[in-house]
Each structure stands twice: as C-alpha cells, then as structure tokens.
Amino acid sequence: MRKFSLLLTLLHVCIFFAAGQAKTRRLPGIINHPSINVQAPYISHDGNALLFVSDMGEDGALTVAYTSRENDWVEPVELPKTINNRSVFLKGFALSADGKRMYFTSAKAPVVGGYDILSSELKGKTWTEPQNLFMPVNSKANEGCPSPTADGKSLYFMRCDNMNYRTASGCKLFRVDKKPNGQWNEPKELPGNINTGNSQSPRIMADSETLIFASDKIPGGKGGMDLYVTRLVNGDWSNPTPLDFVNSELDDQFVTASALGRYLIKETTGARNKMELVEYLIPDDLRPKGMMKVEGSVTDENAAAVPAYITITDLTNGKRVYSGRPAADGSYFVYVREGTRYEFSVDPEQSKLSYFTKLFDLTSEKIPQREKISVVLKQPSPGDEILLNGIQFQPFTAQLDASSDREVKKLVRMMKANPEMIFEIQVLLEGYEEDSLQSSNDLTEMRMDSITTVIEEIDSLGQAFKRDTVLVKTFYHNDRTQKQAEAITNQLVTAGINSDNLKTLTNAIAAIVPGDRKLIIKAVPRLK
C-alpha cells in the first residue's frame, strides 16, 4: 500500500510539472462543448469577455455566442437577432478592451457600401441597437473584421473587394484614429509589406504595437491563409513574420489574445473531430508586450463621482504615458505596459481635497493581469493618513530623488488649501538592521554605545583602589528616518510651507517578514 501511495504521489507531481510547462491549454467545457463546433474567437483585452462562432443555433445553424466571467466563464448565450443575423460577416466580430462594446460587420441597411462596420454597447445584460460607423470608416467597398486598440482611440479593419456571409477576398488592412471630439479621421492604409494582395482579419494586441493578421499572398506560408505578426517600431511596421507555431496546411485566420499576451487562442480540431478553442503559448520572440489593467473608481466619501485627473508617468524617463479623467460615474480603466516602473496619480480639481499616488513595478518576469484601485478624495480631517507613495529617496541615503518633486508639489497644494491644519510627516521603517561591522551598503548610520564599569586594582604600595573604565561599542544601522523626515520638511518649507505648520514622527522596527524591507511615508493632518 505504501509503495502504491508513493507511486500515485510521484505520478501527481509529474503531471503537475508537465501541466506547468504545457504549450497548449484547452478552454473549459462550458465553451468547448463536445457536441458543437466553436470557432473564430475574440477575447476582450481584460480577458473577461469572449465572442465566438458555433453551430449551437437552431438546427445546428452557425451563430455568434457571448460569454463573460468574474472567476469562471458563464454559460454562453447567442447574440440578439438585431446583431446576429444572416446580414453579418459571420467571423467579423470584435470586443472593446473591457468587453462592453462590440464591433461587427453587417450588410443590413442602411449601409454606405456592401458590408459596413457597426457597433453596439452592453447595457446591463442587453446589447443596444447597432449603430453604423458610417463614413469615413465605411466606404463604397466592404469593411470588416474591426479590431480596436486597448484605449479605444484607434480601430484596425480590412477593406475588401468582395465579401459575403462567410468569406472575403481582395482585402487590405487599414487603421483609423479618433479625433478629440470622438469623430473618426480618414482611414490610413497600412504599408505594402503588410498589404500584399489579400490581408485579412487584423488583431491589434493590447500593447498597440503588435499586429497579427492573415494572408495567402505572402511567400513562405504553409498553405491557405496563414497568420503573421508585425510590430510598430519607431513609426514603421516591421516585415511580417509567420506564426509557424500555429500555422498549418489549412486556413489559419481568426485568433485572439488577452492583455497579458502569453497565450494565443485559436480554433483547432479536437475530440470527436469537432472544432474547439485552444490557447497556444506564444514563443518569447513573437510575444506582444504584456499589459496590466488598472481599474477602479474615483469618488467622495458618499460614493459620488468627483471631478479629477488621472495621470500615469513612466519613472524610467519621466514621461507621461497617460492623462485622462474618470467617466461620469467615477469609473475608469487604463492599460500599462510591462517592462518599467510607473507612478499612478489621481488629482482632484479642488485643491482642498486629498489626492492619491501609487507606484507600480512591472519589470519582473510575471506581472498581474489586473490592479483594482478605488480612490476616495476628501477634505483632510484630523488623524487621516495620506500615503506619500510618490516620495522616494536615492538608494541608501536621506536625499530625495528627483521623481519626488511631483508628490511634494501635490502635498504643498493640499496643505496651502487647508491652512487650519498642521501636518505631521511620518517616516516609518519596517526592516531595521544593525551590525557591529558595516556589513552592507544599507548600514550607513553609526551609533556609539558607552558602558561604564568599575575596576578594582592594586597600586604600587599594595593598596586597593577603584577606577571607572568607559567601553565604547560602535554599531552600524540603517535608520535614516529622522534625516529623511527632515529632508521632506525642508523641501516643503522651501516650497512656501510655514515650518510652524510641520511636525515629524519617525520610527524603525525589525521587518515583520525577514528580508521584507518597507519605508512608509505619510502626512497626517492635526488641528493647530
């Protein structure tokens, strides 16, 4: 029995290891039902909504289904007849980054040309009446297979000489950008190294610089329509590279990926010779840059929306990568790219209100898919703790980093707008260390402890006497909190804050988790 148990344990470990290294992952059975075919997937960038074509319709008719998830995928449902009818280009559906807006291709009147691009918005559980994008997006030709960027400000699509319910030919790829007023500019044709005669089904990845498309007019394919990837580098699209890890002798055309960019979802033949949806691990050299979704709300104490500005700054170069406002209900979402560190900031229109800052480090091997941040902006009250996440010090010093200037300016604005308060600058170190030797670069501070002892000795006449001896012990430590607090208050005074309105509080304790060092900086308002 013991040998059998050991064998089972080893078998379990081997299976787990193999699964961890798997290059393919089949979507769950609620989507890949064994009795139906599923094809042409399109997943929202946040990974929580999915469209696909299946023969789950009446009498096995092809239809477009929608599913979503908070944790697990829910039972797919057919799209309403206002969208899902014989007038559509069956595999030309797409979703916005949050899955709340759908773009699709239809020949249902009124249209500008043959097939046009339309959109519909999800309100609760109902899709709104489709709206034609009209000119200049649509033309007298056939437009289809739209693919929006993560920020919704651009749309990639194909314009074709011929199109019907199932197929298209003679296609070129275009990009169209939105004006500040929400209207569309004139579409621009992608360059000749992409448009070689019949390029179709563009899929712009969440990083907005990686484009996957299909073509049967680029040399070196495996047969039929093959998939290619091109990247936008310094304003130019690279020469397309075939996706050999998924291309086959058959038509390979409709694929999709979430913002993390690790896996590509594609239809393939599965059990019982039915088409199913499978995730394929994208090789590192072909993988788009992963994107993390930051979402949440900006409200007051009563959960009402507050007029505010959201900015995201790349801390590597100091450049602002995003600037915008929350929606009318206070909600927001934005995507940030892996590979650098960011400062996320929410600033109110009213100077007397608090503000919010948080730092993101997306330089590690794995990044989270989502960060949810709900911000409450309010007038400071005595005892409130306002985290000063944007204040950073140069390594192993009490010298403020230049990136701290933004946080200091915001703090000065708020303090000047609340003159009835004094503000206590708190600097708290979790991760205090000391040693009798300067054993690391972090141990920049020195403390001397003196110990007085009484020693009895015999003098030259043989008489006993006592004398005091002082022993001095030197310790090196990393508690720079008082110097750091003073550096902050000095900067505030230089910016015009009266020193009488400032206090400091510092403390240093050992790390709660060994090796987990944290420096927490706060501003706490107090009544005068």
Question: PLM features: residue spans?
Answer:
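Structured interaction patches on ligand/partner-binding surfaces of diverse proteins
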Residues: 349-374
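Conserved "repeat-terminator" motif of extracellular CCP/Sushi domains
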Residues: 205, 291, 366-385
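Short, ordered, surface-exposed loop/turn motifs in non-cytosolic proteins
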Residues: 224, 301-317, 403
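Short, conserved micro-motifs composed of acidic
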Residues: 21-297, 301
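Periplasmic OmpA/Pal-like peptidoglycan-binding modules at the C-termini of bacterial envelope proteins
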Residues: 267-278, 378-382, 421, 435-528
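Short, acidic Ser/Thr/Gly-rich low-complexity loop/linker segments typical of extracellular
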Residues: 315-331
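A short, solvent-exposed beta-strand micro-motif common in secreted/extracellular proteins
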Residues: 330, 340-351
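Bacterial Sec-dependent N-terminal signal peptides
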Residues: 1-23
